[in-house]
């Protein structure tokens, strides 16, 4: 941010090995495994006290000029300062989500207004809040082991979020 640059997430994939218990001691590790002047890719691991992986994630983010909120290239000198680590060994699905061509209609769910508690430092709904909204939209008791999120147009304070759901043989989709 000191250079007037930020990063907006474009997509995230989370593979869940097991859900931690409430109050369980956890360690979060994150690192960059790919980066160029336009975007960067990052792994994140959630580890239990024994060092076992509870969840593995990868995300891709695009660099933005914070004064215009538009995508930008970072200066080469900044790119040269980025330390890359090897990518975590996991299944990397394409970052672009293709919604299923479903014969049944999507179920419209209750609308939600983006309130102040959901807003991040860039004045948009925080990425984690989209996860919360999606989880809330799942059918009661729905068990999942993988989450994929595509971040499109960022919602701002006061925006009306209108989720819809489709359950197929491949899984449950929230849009």
Identify what each model region corresponds to:
Residues 1-9, 56-58, 65-145:
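Hot-dog-fold acyl-thioester-processing enzymes
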Residues 4-19, 142-154:
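Small beta-barrel nucleic-acid-binding modules, principally OB-folds
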């Amino acid at each position: 941010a000191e250079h007037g640059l930020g990063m907006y997430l474009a997509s995230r994939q989370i593979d869940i090995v097991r859900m931690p218990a409430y109050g369980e001691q956890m360690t979060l590790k994150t690192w960059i495994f790919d980066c160029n002047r336009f975007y960067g890719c990052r792994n994140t691991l959630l580890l239990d006290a024994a060092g076992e992986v509870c969840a593995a994630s990868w995300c891709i983010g695009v660099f933005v000029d914070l004064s215009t909120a538009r995508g930008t290239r970072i200066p080469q000198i900044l790119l040269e300062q980025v330390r890359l680590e090897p990518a975590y060994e996991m299944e990397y699905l394409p970052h672009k989500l293709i919604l299923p061509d479903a014969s049944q209609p999507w179920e419209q769910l209750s609308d939600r207004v983006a309130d102040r508690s959901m807003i991040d430092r860039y004045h948009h709904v925080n990425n984690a809040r989209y996860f919360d909204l999606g989880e809330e939209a799942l059918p009661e008791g729905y068990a999942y082991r993988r989450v994929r999120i595509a971040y499109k147009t960022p919602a701002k304070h006061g925006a009306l979020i209108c989720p819809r759901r489709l359950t197929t043989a491949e899984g449950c989709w929230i849009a």
